[in-house]
A protein has these predicted regions:
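Helix-loop interface residues and adjacent transmembrane-helix termini in multi-pass membrane transporters
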Residues: 34, 144-145, 172
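Short membrane-interface helical motifs at transmembrane helix boundaries
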Residues: 93-114
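Interfacial transmembrane-helix starts/ends
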Residues: 3-6, 41, 62, 73-89, ...
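Alpha-helical transmembrane segments of multi-pass membrane proteins
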Residues: 112-138, 164
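Signature of the first transmembrane helix
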Residues: 4-62, 163
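Alpha-helical transmembrane segments of multi-pass membrane transporters/permeases
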Residues: 7-12, 127, 141-167
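Transmembrane-helix boundary and interhelical linker motifs in polytopic inner-membrane proteins
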Residues: 28, 54-85, 144-149
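Hydrophobic alpha-helical transmembrane segments
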Residues: 153-167, 172-199
Length: 199
């Protein structure tokens, strides 16, 4: 069983790698090298960095605890509820402060040569950040429960959302649409993750 699970997880990981490669190819095809791809990369730079740090901290601190208490229903439920409450409040804080975060990011990085709508694009990128943090908590829960395949599946949803947008909106594709694809994928991954945990 362990060998079969390891093979399954390896295949899912490779699949995620292929999805990432497909996204890079589609972005290059749709945007090439220029202002739009610079806007996409710059708008995501800080929000993705923040989400990655917070998710890594959650994974490092939560996984050992969850692994230890997963067979104790009361403690497990109490801890999971506390973790979900924490990331929900953090996501709400980011959404409330989104205007200030976008302004601060524009002060840190020179956006003078990218899209004129960069302010709005950065705000959307911070929404992506909030969703990624919530997803990161769910991934930590699955890793702690040693249900790694679900963690990997959740990660793939963001890539799938972007790919679908790039494929079906190729004539009208824009940075905002790509970010919308990320948000859509993250949203459905969160819904699926919460459903699996609560079933």
């Amino acid at each position: 069983i362990m060998i079969r699970s390891s093979i399954y997880i390896t295949l899912l990981t490779l699949g995620n790698g292929l999805l990432g490669f497909a996204i890079q190819m589609l972005l290059a095809k749709n945007f090439g090298v220029g202002v739009e791809i610079d806007t996409y990369l710059f708008s995501l730079s800080i929000p993705i960095f923040v989400a990655a740090i917070i998710s890594s901290i959650m994974n490092y601190t939560s996984v050992p605890v969850i692994a230890k208490i997963k067979n104790d229903p009361d403690r497990f439920e109490k801890y999971i509820n506390s973790l979900i409450l924490f990331v929900t409040l953090l996501a709400i804080f980011i959404l409330v402060m989104i205007g200030y975060l976008a302004e601060a990011q524009q002060l840190l990085i020179d956006y003078s040569y990218v899209d004129n709508n960069i302010g709005e694009i950065i705000k959307i990128a911070w929404i992506v950040c909030a969703l990624q943090i919530f997803q990161g908590a769910l991934i930590s829960i699955f890793n702690g429960m040693q249900r790694h395949k679900y963690a990997i599946i959740l990660v793939s949803f963001q890539s799938i959302g972007v790919i679908l947008i790039l494929i079906f909106s190729y004539q009208f594709v824009s940075v905002i649409l790509v970010l919308f694809g990320m948000m859509l994928g993250l949203f459905f991954s969160i819904v699926l993750g919460v459903y699996i945990i609560n079933r």
